[in-house]
């Protein structure tokens, strides 16, 4: 009787397995079919274009757009659509003012695809990310310096690109900001009668940021620092350079009274 019980149990289990297999769909039918790279890319663009609302306004679903583009990258990493999707994700973050996220994608694109035709664009946009996070002359200038570093790279490596032409104006603006920042620190030391520290800052403006419109002022204040430190010969030489090169400036007229030979 014990043998019949074991045999009956075995037959019962075998029958259950057969019935279970018969009632379960094949594994490949359970897996959802992944759309093509082109279709996923098209879906991402549709989410970016958004839907018209209230006649004039469009609602853009950046999250779904990024998800679609990421699906392209995950499922078709070697397709051209994957490369384009990297750019689309970067731009989607940028358009939401999420500059750190955008910056990561722009920098990675330039590093991973150094020969791609859009590299100049990504370097320029990386500079823009830093630019949008930068501050005026009176505050920390780390982002300003990072933006300039990207623009230096853009202008030196891709001088004929449209982005280089656009970047030159930004480059000049940012360098002027750094010069103004240095001048502000010089003024800070000057007000506290720390003339050597002030002179070092004014000198740095002349050495590092010439031709940005601050040369005359920097020369004048450098001369004043030397005068206050009783380095009269150096002060006279600086004032003379000021008079010879910026004769019509307001500070040159003030310096004229401080140079006996010029009167």
Model-derived regions: residue spans:
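Bacterial N-terminal signal peptides
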Residues: 8-18
């Amino acid at each position: 009787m014990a043998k019949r019980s074991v045999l009956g149990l075995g037959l019962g289990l075998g029958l259950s397995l057969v019935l279970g297999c018969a009632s379960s769909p094949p594994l490949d039918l359970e897996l959802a079919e992944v759309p093509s790279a082109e279709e996923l890319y098209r879906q991402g663009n549709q989410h970016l274009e958004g839907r018209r609302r209230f006649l004039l306004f469009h609602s853009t679903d950046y999250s779904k757009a990024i998800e679609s583009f990421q699906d392209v990258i995950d499922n078709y990493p070697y397709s051209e659509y994957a490369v384009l999707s990297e750019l689309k994700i970067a731009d989607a973050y940028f358009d939401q003012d999420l500059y750190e996220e955008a910056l990561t994608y722009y920098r990675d694109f330039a590093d991973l695809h150094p020969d791609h035709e859009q590299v100049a664009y990504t370097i320029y946009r990386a500079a823009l990310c830093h630019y949008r996070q930068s501050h005026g002359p009176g505050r920390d200038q780390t982002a300003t310096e990072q933006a300039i570093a990207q623009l230096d790279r853009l202008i030196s490596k891709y001088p004929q690109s449209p982005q280089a032409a656009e970047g030159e104006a930004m480059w000049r603006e940012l360098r002027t900001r750094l010069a103004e920042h240095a001048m502000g620190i010089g003024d800070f030391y000057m007000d506290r009668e720390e003339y050597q520290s002030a002179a070092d800052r004014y000198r740095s403006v002349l050495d590092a940021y010439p031709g940005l419109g601050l040369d005359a002022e920097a020369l004048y204040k450098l001369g004043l620092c030397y005068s206050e430190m009783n380095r009269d010969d150096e002060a006279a030489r600086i004032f003379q350079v000021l008079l010879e090169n910026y004769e019509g400036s307001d500070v040159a007229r003030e310096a004229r009274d401080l140079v006996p030979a010029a009167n």
